[in-house]
Amino acid sequence: RAVNLKVIGKHGVGCNTIDLAAAKELGVPVINTPFANTNSVAELIVGLMLDISRNISVCDKKSRGEGFSCIAPPEMTGIELTGKAVGLVGMGNISRRMGEILKNGFNAKLMGYDPYCSKEQADSYGIEKFEDLNRMLEASDIVNISVPLTPSTENLISSGNLNHFKKNAILINAARGGVVNEEDLYQALKHRTLRAAACDAFVEEPPSGKNKLMTLDNFCATPHIGANTEEALYRMGMEVVEEVLNVIDGKQAKNRVV
């Protein structure tokens, strides 16, 4: 029906809400801003790691309510990020930037699984590439998910490979809801086969108390705020307008998806 549609601009990275096949068939270019929010999302991921490794949100919530019977309560004992082995599911811009922060700031060992990244590329990033996802999970203290939601990544993390996580491992998903099977994650956290997890993306958004994950004290939720910083929003706005104008003016778009 949009017979005069000339271009679709995505204010962000993920294009799972756009019918790319239809756009391609109709010859409508789709552009996005893949680099504008990289730093903001990477920083949130590190923040979530710090939160769940040190029980920050749990301590805050309980301190505002019933409180604790002593200082430094034993049940709130956390773990350090320093020196941990971090598994990167996906080695794109966000994942690499997050890895850079962890490597420089916490002396982390970086490992990665990404079928679209060669060993040579991974080596140049300072990341040990794994060809098998489960083997990487078995070696990881912390696992971060940074992949788009596609038919091949839907339920990429589910009961089958959650069993390969270390019992004391933590999981972060700030990518897309649906990449991690939420029911399977709930069971792993409930039965403590996984230490803790944090998600910034859910199947149903924004997240609410209807989601069983919200009943767990070893789970932290944020309402898809990865790119929600003043700096990233400004960059995304400027870049998407620039790219749309490039297409309309017959120029080459730098970040064309289709």
Predicted regions: what they are:
Residues 10, 144-145, 173, 221:
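Redox-cofactor binding/interface segments in oxidoreductases and associated redox assembly factors
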Residues 26, 34-85, 97-101, 105:
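Phosphate-binding beta-alpha-beta segment of Rossmann-like dinucleotide-binding domains, i.e.
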Residues 13, 141, 147-149, 175-176, ...:
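Short glycine-/small-residue-rich Rossmann-like dinucleotide-binding loops
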Residues 2-7, 26-28, 107-108, 167-169, ...:
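A short helix->loop->beta-strand "cap" motif at the edges of active sites that frequently abuts
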Residues 74-167:
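Rossmann-like dinucleotide/phosphate-binding beta-alpha-beta segment
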Residues 11-12, 28-39, 133, 175, ...:
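Short beta->alpha connector loops at strand-helix junctions that form conserved
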Residues 168-258:
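Rossmann-like dinucleotide-binding domain for NAD(H)/NADP(H)
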